[in-house]
């Protein structure tokens, strides 16, 4: 199975209603659309998209799914900020019948998850806002391989023609 980690796009720094409600800024929306265009053009779209319930992650997932012509994302509470790698892999196992699953979430959760799957320690992985990482995992094994890590600038954080 391929697990695509799509970090939410650039969001507002603060929100009067708290961290949960921080929304994407236009650059963050463009990052999500760029990621969708890139994966679509490469034939690497996921079969299903799961997202954190936080506003910025849901908005990233919505922009991504709309641009890629995919069904809407499924909100998963375990993807909220503060996700534990063991919990993530346990919850993710429910989707093992899919060849390619995308999850939209947060840092440092995604870097920690990628390092845990890759068996890397010491902060060897960084997933920036709007970046895409893809890991190949063969359940029930915990370990996997990094297939690609695309920074937001290569993923297309600007619109075509800009």
Regions found by a protein language model. Give the residues of each.
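Domain-level recognition of soluble alpha/beta enzyme cores
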Residues: 118-145, 151-155
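Short Pro/Gly-enriched beta-strand edge/turn motifs at strand-loop
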Residues: 74, 114-119
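Active-site-proximal alpha-helix that buttresses catalytic centers in soluble enzyme cores
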Residues: 2-83, 90, 110, 123-129, ...
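Extended, charge-rich low-complexity interaction segments
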Residues: 107-116, 158-162
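Glycine-rich phosphate-binding loop signature in dinucleotide/nucleotide-binding domains
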Residues: 42-44, 94-99
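A short acidic, often aromatic-flanked loop/helix-cap motif at beta-alpha or helix-coil junctions
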Residues: 80-84, 154-157
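Generic beta-sheet signal
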Residues: 3, 97-105
């Amino acid at each position: 199975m391929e697990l695509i980690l799509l970090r939410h796009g650039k969001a507002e720094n603060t929100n009067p209603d708290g961290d949960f409600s921080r929304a994407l800024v236009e650059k963050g929306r463009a990052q999500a659309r760029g990621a969708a265009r890139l994966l679509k053009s490469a034939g690497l779209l996921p079969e299903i998209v799961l997202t954190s319930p936080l506003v910025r992650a849901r908005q990233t997932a919505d922009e991504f799914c709309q641009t890629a012509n995919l069904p809407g994302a499924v909100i998963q509470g375990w993807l909220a900020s503060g996700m534990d790698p063991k919990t993530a892999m346990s919850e993710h196992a429910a989707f093992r019948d899919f060849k390619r699953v995308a999850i939209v979430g947060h840092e440092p959760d995604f870097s920690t998850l990628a390092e845990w799957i890759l068996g890397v320690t010491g902060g060897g992985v960084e997933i920036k806002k709007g970046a895409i990482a893809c890991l190949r995992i063969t359940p029930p094994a915990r370990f996997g391989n990094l297939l690609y890590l695309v920074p937001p600038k290569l993923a297309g954080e600007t619109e075509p023609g800009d």
